[in-house]
A protein has these predicted regions:
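Glycine-rich phosphate-binding loop signature in dinucleotide/nucleotide-binding domains
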Residues: 54-58, 82
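Short, glycine-/small-residue-rich phosphate/pyrophosphate-handling segment
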Residues: 102-129
């Protein structure tokens, strides 16, 4: 099974993991990695190592919040040193829920990367409201 690590600035990752459990049910091997203002890249690398230790798996998917942000940069360094990890940025709730659903069906790392990319983008919708009809 692919372990999923959700990494974000502040405590967003914890909120995403908790919210996904409301929708998809509690999941094994889903870890939130937080990043506080007092922390640096080495702290994040240590947190990724701890997440892997806490959720031993064949493969790891790290879903980071922002391309170029510290959680992503550290995740990219972490994954580059391994053969069993990939990183996708722009994590949102639709992305996480879809990834967990596909994982429950036995999806491998490559499949989950594709699902994450597609679901993350498709989860963003714009609903135009006819403001003239709104009172």
């Amino acid at each position: 099974m692919v372990a999923v690590i959700v990494a974000a600035h502040g405590h967003l990752a914890e909120g995403l993991v908790a919210s996904s459990a409301m929708i998809a049910g509690p999941q094994d091997d889903v870890v939130a990695v937080t990043f506080d203002p007092s922390e640096g890249p080495d702290d994040l690398l240590a947190k990724y190592a701890a997440a892997v230790e806490a959720s031993p798996s064949d493969q790891y998917l790290i879903l980071a919040d922002l391309f170029g942000g510290s959680p992503y940069n550290a995740a990219a360094r972490f994954a580059a040193a391994r053969d069993d990890a990939d990183v996708v940025t722009g994590v949102n709730l639709p992305m996480l829920v879809e990834v967990l659903g596909r994982r429950m069906l036995g999806g491998n790392l490559a499949e989950l990367v594709e699902v994450a990319s597609t679901a993350g983008a498709n989860g963003v919708k714009v609903k135009f409201v006819d403001r003239k009809s709104v009172v």
